[in-house]
Design a protein with these regions (language model features):
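Acyl-donor binding region in acyl/amide transferases
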Residues: 86-165
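Amphipathic alpha-helical interaction segments
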Residues: 72-74, 88
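Short amphipathic alpha-helix that is part of the acyltransferase structural core
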Residues: 4-52, 57-60, 64-68, 75, ...
């Protein structure tokens, strides 16, 4: 990829998408519906729910971010920042709870980090129409060398980068 040739990342991203904090209940429900479409219906990582929303106990202490498509104004992606519980900082973040044996404490030891300054980024979800191209396999994410483009036609993965920024 020829990043310097891509141009201004923010301007290019803003042509197609806007990112907003999901602070209203209505917007949070839209985020939970996107997560359900991706994690439950498409990928089968979680069980489907009659309300067609995917949520868990960490959502109450999370900041939810929504990705809105400029073309039609609908929410097409999301991500969340799980914060440590201010009333019970000893409560673990999802990664700490689910992957405790995988954490290399010689690199970082969560027990030594200020709990109030720590968050976990999780539940990144993008509707398949915005994540996949025609001809992609049934895999959740298909990336190839061509995705980065060429010198004559550079490309950049705006959606995941935009959600993480």
């Amino acid at each position: 990829m020829f990043l310097l040739e891509v141009g201004n990342l923010k301007e290019n991203f803003a042509k197609y998408f806007s990112v907003e904090a999901a602070v209203t209940e209505e917007l949070k429900h839209e985020v939970f519906r996107v997560r359900h479409a991706v994690y439950c219906e498409e990928l089968g990582y979680e069980n489907t729910n009659p309300d067609q929303e995917e949520s868990d106990s960490y959502d109450a202490r999370s900041l939810h971010i929504a990705l809105r498509a400029q073309a039609h104004g609908r929410i097409v992606g999301c991500v969340r920042l799980v914060q440590c519980d201010p009333d019970a900082p000893e409560k673990l973040l999802p990664f700490e709870k689910l992957c405790t044996d995988a954490i290399d404490r010689s690199i970082i030891d969560p027990a030594q980090v200020n709990r109030h300054a720590m968050v976990e980024i999780s539940r990144l979800a993008v509707l398949s129409d915005y994540r996949k191209r025609k001809g992609d396999s049934g895999s959740p994410m298909a990336i190839s060398e061509e995705d980065m483009g060429t010198r004559d036609q550079p490309r950049f993965p705006y959606i995941p980068v935009g959600l993480y920024l």
